[in-house]
């Protein structure tokens, strides 16, 4: 009976001794390590250390804004980080040289630590990835304007059309110009251009096709014949 009690007491004592030891190991402040202190001061994290990337030492403004940024963020939780940076930059410019001097001294101390720890360090800024150029052309919008030119009486007249229906009307007009009847090409082109511009883009395809299918006006005894027209 006495031996059993001693065994239980010994097991309980071991458990009590292990619990505080585990607590001290878990909650021991990690900032006692000078390397961890330096990593905290320079803003390093596990991802950068895993990639073997050495961060630059903080300058005077970064040393000053480290605490100021935290204060501004607590006072204005809705403020975005970019707005906080602008406000801190303005406040830093308003400080006098005497007010800035302690932060310059701290920055020099951090730079000295950085040189001792990384004597071969060279600053290599990260390059921004350039977007890859695609060789594929984007599809043209249905409302995009396409133009062609027609040579009439040694002058080029632009002819504008929007879609396949307008192209069909343009081809039909070219076929009519190739017939034996004389036509005033310049007046016909100008009237077609005015008609297409006055047509609303909100019209339905059926209405647009009906407008474009209309024959251009003919002028029987006017200036130009078939031999004077040239189509590229």
Swiss-Prot record:
Q: What is this protein called?
A: Sex-determining region Y protein
Record feature DNA-binding region, as residue ranges = 54-122
Q: Known Pfam families for this protein?
A: HMG_box
Where is the region Disordered?
24-53, 196-215
Q: Does the keyword Chaperone apply?
A: no
Q: Which family does it belong to?
A: Belongs to the SRY family.
A GO CC term attached to the entry: nuclear speck
- Gene3D superfamilies membership: High mobility group box domain (1.10.30.10)
Keyword Cytoplasm on this protein?
Answer: yes
Among InterPro entries, the record links this protein to:
HMG_box_dom, HMG_box_dom_sf, SRY, SRY-related_HMG-box_TF-like
Task: Cite the record's note on assembly.
Answer: Interacts with CALM, EP300, HDAC3, KPNB1, ZNF208 isoform KRAB-O, PARP1, SLC9A3R2 and WT1. The interaction with EP300 modulates its DNA-binding activity. The interaction with KPNB1 is sensitive to dissociation by Ran in the GTP-bound form. Interaction with PARP1 impaired its DNA-binding activity.
Q: Which GO terms describe its biological process?
A: cell differentiation; male sex determination; sex differentiation
List the PROSITE patterns hit by this protein, alphabetically: HMG_BOX_2
Localization per record? Nucleus speckle; Cytoplasm; Nucleus
* Domain of life (superkingdom): Eukaryota
A GO term for molecular function:
DNA-binding transcription activator activity, RNA polymerase II-specific
Species name for this entry? Halichoerus grypus
- Role summary: Transcriptional regulator that controls a genetic switch in male development. It is necessary and sufficient for initiating male sex determination by directing the development of supporting cell precursors (pre-Sertoli cells) as Sertoli rather than granulosa cells. Involved in different aspects of gene regulation including promoter activation or repression. Binds to the DNA consensus sequence 5'-[AT]AACAA[AT]-3'. SRY HMG box recognizes DNA by partial intercalation in the minor groove and promotes DNA bending. Also involved in pre-mRNA splicing.
Q: What keywords are annotated for this sequence in UniProt?
A: Activator, Calmodulin-binding, Cytoplasm, Differentiation, DNA-binding, Nucleus, Sexual differentiation, Transcription, Transcription regulation
């Amino acid at each position: 009976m006495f031996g059993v009690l001693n065994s239980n007491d010994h097991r309980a004592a071991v458990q009590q001794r292990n619990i505080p030891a585990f607590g001290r190991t878990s909650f021991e402040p990690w900032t006692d390590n000078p390397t961890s202190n330096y990593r905290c001061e320079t803003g390093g994290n596990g991802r950068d250390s895993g990639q073997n990337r050495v961060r630059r030492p903080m300058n005077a403004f970064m040393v000053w804004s480290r605490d100021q940024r935290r204060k501004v963020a607590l006072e204005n939780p809705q403020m975005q980080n970019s707005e906080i940076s602008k406000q801190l930059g303005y406040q830093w410019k308003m400080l006098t040289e005497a007010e800035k001097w302690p932060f310059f001294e701290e920055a020099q101390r951090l730079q000295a630590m950085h040189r001792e720890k990384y004597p071969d360090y060279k600053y290599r800024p990260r390059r921004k990835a350039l977007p890859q150029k695609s060789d594929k052309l984007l599809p043209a919008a249905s409302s995009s304007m396409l133009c062609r030119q027609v040579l009439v009486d040694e002058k080029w007249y632009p002819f504008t059309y929007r879609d396949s229906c307008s192209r069909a009307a343009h081809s039909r007009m070219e076929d009519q110009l190739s017939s034996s009847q004389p036509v005033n090409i310049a007046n016909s082109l100008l009237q077609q251009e005015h008609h297409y511009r006055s047509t609303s883009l909100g019209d339905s395809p059926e209405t647009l096709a009906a407008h474009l299918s209309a024959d251009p006006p003919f002028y029987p005894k006017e200036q130009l014949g078939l031999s004077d027209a040239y189509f590229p």
